[in-house]
Amino acid sequence: MARRPRRSDSSSAEPTLSPQHLLALVRSTIPPIHPAGRPFIAAGLAVAGVGYRHRWARRTGLLAAGACAGFFRHPPRVPPSRAGAIVAPADGVICVIDTAAPPAELSMGDAPLPRVSIFLSVFDAHVQRAPVSGEVVAVQHRPGRFGSADLPAASNDNERNSVRIRTANGAEVVAVQVAGLVARRIVCDAHVGDKLAIGDTYGLIRFGSRLDTYLPPGTEPVVIVGQRTIAGETILADLP
């Protein structure tokens, strides 16, 4: 009886796990770290290294490094393809939906605009993303207090940084980074004249904070208070 010929093509080979494939799997599973977090992680690892002979110091350093790695994580996001969508600029929970005048330092007048506020706990990713595609026409920082970011007064009293973005059709959306009780450092990489695509990372607030998004007049939010948001993906509203 004739034997079936042995297949010599590559499809019969046993699958192998190459170093390149393993590295790709790790990168797809573990999100990258925002550059602002690297000094904090390095400090934790340094404590663990210096005190490696002492269990408490080693564990404390490793725990701090791991916590900072989680806090400063920068996970990839896929913005919606729907035209005119305004997405959440931050991960967190919607704490306020109301109307309010935009920050005075932007010189946009006193007329109230629809506003959606997102509270970020220390467990949320703290990178901020552009809510719409457009050009940055104003960036204004205003010093202030460091009260609890979940209180209504935080928007007016706390330190904040406002980024005003003008879309291609002329509509304007304002994203305001608000410092909190623990968050005492606002990082903003956006500058006047920058062109941002929806979902682009433009900043970060360290250790708990709040994000206020001021929408164009006539915009109707499609989210509710208490809803969790994913930065760059959750749709807050549609441009009018």
From Swiss-Prot:
The gene is psd. It holds the Pfam family PS_Dcarbxylase. It is found in: Cell membrane. Pathway: Phospholipid metabolism; phosphatidylethanolamine biosynthesis; phosphatidylethanolamine from CDP-diacylglycerol: step 2/2. Coiled coil: none annotated. The modification Pyruvic acid (Ser) is found at S209. The keyword Lipid biosynthesis applies. The record marks G208, S209 as: Cleavage (non-hydrolytic). Its main location: membrane. One of its GO terms (molecular function) is phosphatidylserine decarboxylase activity. It catalyses: a 1,2-diacyl-sn-glycero-3-phospho-L-serine + H(+) = a 1,2-diacyl-sn-glycero-3-phosphoethanolamine + CO2. It comes from the Bacteria. Keywords: Cell membrane, Decarboxylase, Lipid biosynthesis, Lipid metabolism, Lyase, Membrane, Phospholipid biosynthesis, Phospholipid metabolism, Pyruvate, Zymogen. This is Phosphatidylserine decarboxylase proenzyme. Its cofactor is pyruvate. Catalyzes the formation of phosphatidylethanolamine (PtdEtn) from phosphatidylserine (PtdSer). Heterodimer of a large membrane-associated beta subunit and a small pyruvoyl-containing alpha subunit. Binds 1 pyruvoyl group covalently per subunit. Is synthesized initially as an inactive proenzyme. Formation of the active enzyme involves a self-maturation process in which the active site pyruvoyl group is generated from an internal serine residue via an autocatalytic post-translational modification. Two non-identical subunits are generated from the proenzyme in this reaction, and the pyruvate is formed at the N-terminus of the alpha chain, which is derived from the carboxyl end of the proenzyme. GO terms for biological process: phosphatidylethanolamine biosynthetic process. It is a peripheral membrane protein. Belongs to the phosphatidylserine decarboxylase family. PSD-A subfamily. The active site is at S209. One of its GO terms (cellular component) is plasma membrane.
